[in-house]
Amino acid sequence: TAYRRQRQMCIRDRNIPIQIAQIAKSNSIKSFFFVSSGYADPKNSSDYLKFKGLVEQEIKNQNFDKIGIMRPSFLLGNRKEKRIGEKFGIILFKFLTPILVGPLRKMRPIRAEIVAKAMVKLANENINQSIFESNEIAELVR
């Protein structure tokens, strides 16, 4: 049911990152990096993006010395689950990528491997920024 899927999303997208952050903090880990969502904002009108923004806030409140919040647009790569709406969005945005310039660059889809490489680079270098949109994630790896 839709309620069950919504509940599973809450467990996966909220509880897991927050619990991992709490465990990391309690074990004196100084840095924390995680993948959120493009346009995440507690004030967003979209429930999903509002939810993601609240998760970001909760993790920021853990006061890590260094934090990396990756906000990719559509993530490209192999997935086990089938998300028809997301698949349509990926196809559409791949087609639109050449015209996504200027402030729209953060809407470009990005490969999951690029996000992972950017997180590793962020962990190993002195980069004084905590939130990275899709275009900024790609620039980290170039």
Named regions from a protein language model:
Residues 32-38, 70-72:
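SDR active-site strand-loop-helix element
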Residues 12-16:
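Glycine-rich NAD(P)-binding loop of the Rossmann-fold in SDR/ketoreductase-type enzymes
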Residues 24:
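Hydrophobic pocket-lining residues that define ligand/cofactor binding sites across diverse proteins
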Residues 27-31, 63-65:
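A short helix->loop->beta-strand "cap" motif at the edges of active sites that frequently abuts
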